[in-house]
Amino acid sequence: ALVAGLDLLPVTPSGHPLKDLTKAPVFAAMIPMQVYNSLQVPEEKAILQQIRHLIIGGGPIDSQLNAALKDFPHAVWSTYGMTETLSHIALRRLNGPEASDWYTPFESIQIRLSKENTLVIYAPEICEKELVTNDIAEINGQNQFRILGRKDNTINTGGVKVQIEQVEAALKEHLSVPFLITSAPDEKFGEIIVLLAEGQLPDDIEQT
């Protein structure tokens, strides 16, 4: 803000950071929960839509939240970063013609995959050594990446590695009750995939 000559608008940290604002800032950084909360209040939603540059970080963006942001008139970005990188090191556009599933690293950032297909980051301006993450990723020909899940969320069932996040994403549109995917020991397959649901499953979901 100081480098760009911007005016800072201090707000009290909360789940509704826009509630006391009367005009939209040019730039804002929020977490997914704050964006979701703001969308539920008409006055806050109106301000949210007027933000010229909105970056969202600190956690994954749900597909429904992503869909709610696609028609925003100004630029909305998802950021990728962690404590070790001090700030975000890549951006992914969520709306407009440049919307993408892939993160584009900043020019000074180099990326590669480890032998376990986890993302490895080299940010020489921040750290001398490479940072090996637990995020299982895919890198395309344009040196962009997307996150498939966490290494510690992989189930090896019968020699087939299944990423929990991908299974949950596939099931989410079919299940209206809260649920999660986990695993259980199995004599034949070593591990089997288990669905834990809160409440009654729909009748058309086969239970075995």
Show which residues each predicted segment covers.
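AMP-binding/adenylate-forming catalytic core of the ANL superfamily
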Residues: 134-208
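Short beta-strand-to-turn element immediately C-terminal to the catalytic PLP-Schiff-base lysine
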Residues: 90-94, 114, 198
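Structural motif
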Residues: 27-29, 55, 196
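Conserved acidic residues
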Residues: 25-27, 52, 135
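AMP-binding/adenylate-forming core of the ANL superfamily
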Residues: 110-132, 136-138, 144, 194
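Gly/Ser/Thr-rich phosphate-binding loop
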Residues: 41-97
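Beta-strand->loop->alpha-helix junctions that form or flank phosphate-binding loops
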Residues: 77-84, 103-104, 182-185
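AMP-binding/adenylate-forming
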Residues: 1-37
